[in-house]
Amino acid sequence: MEPRAGVSKQDIREQIWDYMESQNLADFPRPVHHRIPNFKGASRAAEHFPRLQAFKMARTIKVNPDAPQKNARFFVLESKKTLLVPTPRLRTGLFNKITPPPGATKDILRKCATSQGVRNYSTPVGLDSKVLVDLVVVGSVAVSEKGWRIGKGEGYADLEYAMMVSMGAVSQGTPVVTIVHDCQVVDIPEALLEDHDLTVDYILTPTRVITTGCERPKPAGIAWSKISCEMLGKMPILRSLRHQEEQAGKDVTLRDGPRSPPGATRSPRDLAPPELGSVPLSSVQIGNLPRDARVSELKRALSALGVAPSRLTWQGPQHGAFLHYRDPAEAQQAIACLQGFRLGANTVRVVLARQQRASDLVGSHTAEPLPDHQPAIAGP
């Protein structure tokens, strides 16, 4: 199956999706349209993965969270290597580190490799973690033997890689692997490729291992001119990276936003915490923290999510905390980012607390009650 002449990326996607469904090559979840398609034989294709020399040499491996890469995630855990999985749509950070329970059996490791396991056994990895990724696995809708790749059209794999470059986690020499059905290996016109498109070095199918020898440069960092204000608003970690690059004097002009002049920085006054007694803060109340949670652990997680507060009031005995932000907009953004947030095995409860003056921070807090059937967090 080869794409017809004069096609677009979307034409190729639709052709692959339609073919996999019509030939019953697709596996759950179906239909595969608008997804990284799962396929019959995905586990067979993944069996090539631990045989790659790049896998044997790697210590830390990033694998996408899609269904056809489930066995690849299992092989990473079974080999006692560090497994990093991107957070869905990058809404709450970039990576989660999957940490199986002590003494985990193969059955438990297989559960850890599922989407549910990724949620239950993960901890956020922040921008300041200095992580080095030795091998990258991405999903694809279509890929060519030359190593040119087409994703599902949302650009997350390209952006994930670019963000890893920006934080120093990968380099041009970091190998990239994709796992696909044989029918997904097609000719892709080079004219369709853009500078921000990620290429691959190895293609694993149920019947073949293809070494692409691709020499086209991989993305050298985030192409800010391709990023919209809307996308930036949904991804706190992207905002953090943009601020870092802005501080370094790089051009971080967005596709649809005003230009930030190179070298522009916030004034010390902008960065300073509010003075006590003068500026009201917006507070977020969180509860259902694990009994053994530590304040340092929570601070690291919040930083990784890009929602570090101006001040944090710890309420360990009540398994909760107050997060104090500079304004209501920051507080609402934090609440949005913390929906479904897990610390350890617990899903954290989040609610907007009654706005307090900064001077209240030296005394006790009186927060609005949590929603019905949720235990309130008492003030100190």
Curated annotation (Swiss-Prot):
InterPro entries: FTHF_cligase, FTHF_cligase-like_sf, NagB/RpiA_transferase-like, Nucleotide-bd_a/b_plait_sf, RBD_domain_sf, RRM_dom. Residues 282-355 form the RRM domain. Residues 245-283, 361-380 are annotated as: Disordered. The keyword Disulfide bond does not apply. GO terms for cellular component: cytoplasm. Keywords: RNA-binding. GO terms for molecular function: RNA binding. PROSITE patterns: RRM. The keyword RNA-binding applies. SUPFAM superfamilies: NagB/RpiA/CoA transferase-like, RNA-binding domain, RBD. This is Methenyltetrahydrofolate synthase domain-containing protein. The lineage of its organism: Eukaryota, Metazoa, Chordata, Craniata, Vertebrata.
